[in-house]
Amino acid sequence: MTNIRKTHPLMKIINSSFIDLPAPSNISSWWNFGSLLGICLIIQILTGLFLAMHYTSDTVTAFSSVTHICRDVNYGWLIRYLHANGASMFFICLFLHVGRGLYYGSYMFLETWNIGVLLLFAVMATAFMGYVLPWGQMSFWGATVITNLLSAIPYIGSDLVQWIWGGFSVDKATLTRFFAFHFILPFIIAALAGVHLLFLHETGSNNPSGLSSDADKIPFHPYYTIKDILGVLLLILVLTTLVLFSPDLLGDPDNYTPANPLNTPPHIKPEWYFLFAYAILRSIPNKLGGVLALVLSILVLAFIPFLHTSKQRSMMFRPFSQCLFWILVADLITLTWIGGQPVEHPFIIIGQLASILYFFLILVLMPITSLLENNLLKW
């Protein structure tokens, strides 16, 4: 009798994706982040669902409903902090996942990579709208500042902003629609993640060497299921440690003050995972230029496959490119730090230099270095 997992229509899909999937024998722990992102998404959807049962998307009651969740709902504080810090874990995994793709040349799978970029935009949009929901000071002013950026779009800008706001300022209509979008987007993200996997399984996984692994494949189960479970346990360990010992470590104290349109906080800044993009936005004095740079800071990822000039796929055997990659990582850490600092000397000039370096590295230095390495190897 044939095994049910190989005959049943639904089980066949699961089997070919997670059990009998041929995987390269040499993929390292950097390949764990895909499954970790899946776990993060599940955690976020589940905790978000339970939060939505008690949350009210009204400007008058939103803040107090979050307080009510933390004080009166059974384990409400746990659900709320798992959701808030789960977002941080989500972005840590996202950045590492993208970094892995850049280092090992996974971007050569064009469809998979482009859907990944789309997913990154969707997750960032979801996180931004989620940050607005508690209706604290930073929620309100963050929403005001970021949505206002759209007014830089010529001709239709101001109409577009009012259309998004549902009025002449960030108010009840804005909060309600942000809640609706924040609820629906994770399910769209889940569907996109399914398509992301579908395209990945068309080609099979890349591996650290960047060479074809067709000659040496192993089944996904038990080898990589066990490996993924270890990653998941470590993720849960870090997340629960964060939630139970210092749940507000990554948050902003200003968000514990109810939103007040008449009082602007001294330093308006987004959550830590947006600070690098925020620093790039602030480094350009012109409003439209800043908005374009902000979008390009993520959209530049979509151009990377076309800037690949090396004859090797991975950076594993390319020391000069490795140096530039780690300079890029250091540059992003610098931008994240600058994004959280006030707009004053010397932070302004550091931010501007780091922003220039970010685009210069990706668009100019890395492709040229790859060509140089080809010549050094007489390829």
Curated annotation (Swiss-Prot):
A ubiquinone binds at H201. Heme b b562 binds at H83, H182. It is a multi-pass membrane protein. GO terms for biological process: mitochondrial electron transport, ubiquinol to cytochrome c. GO terms for cellular component: mitochondrial inner membrane; respiratory chain complex III. GO terms for molecular function: metal ion binding; ubiquinol-cytochrome-c reductase activity. Keywords: Electron transport, Heme, Iron, Membrane, Metal-binding, Mitochondrion, Mitochondrion inner membrane, Respiratory chain, Transmembrane, Transmembrane helix, Transport, Ubiquinone. It holds the Pfam family Cytochrom_B_C. The chain crosses the membrane at residues 33-53, 77-98, 113-133, 178-198, 226-246, 288-308, 320-340, 347-367. Heme 1 (or BL or b562) is low-potential and absorbs at about 562 nm, and heme 2 (or BH or b566) is high-potential and absorbs at about 566 nm. The cytochrome bc1 complex contains 11 subunits: 3 respiratory subunits (MT-CYB, CYC1 and UQCRFS1), 2 core proteins (UQCRC1 and UQCRC2) and 6 low-molecular weight proteins (UQCRH/QCR6, UQCRB/QCR7, UQCRQ/QCR8, UQCR10/QCR9, UQCR11/QCR10 and a cleavage product of UQCRFS1). This cytochrome bc1 complex then forms a dimer. Component of the ubiquinol-cytochrome c reductase complex (complex III or cytochrome b-c1 complex) that is part of the mitochondrial respiratory chain. The b-c1 complex mediates electron transfer from ubiquinol to cytochrome c. Contributes to the generation of a proton gradient across the mitochondrial membrane that is then used for ATP synthesis. This is Cytochrome b.
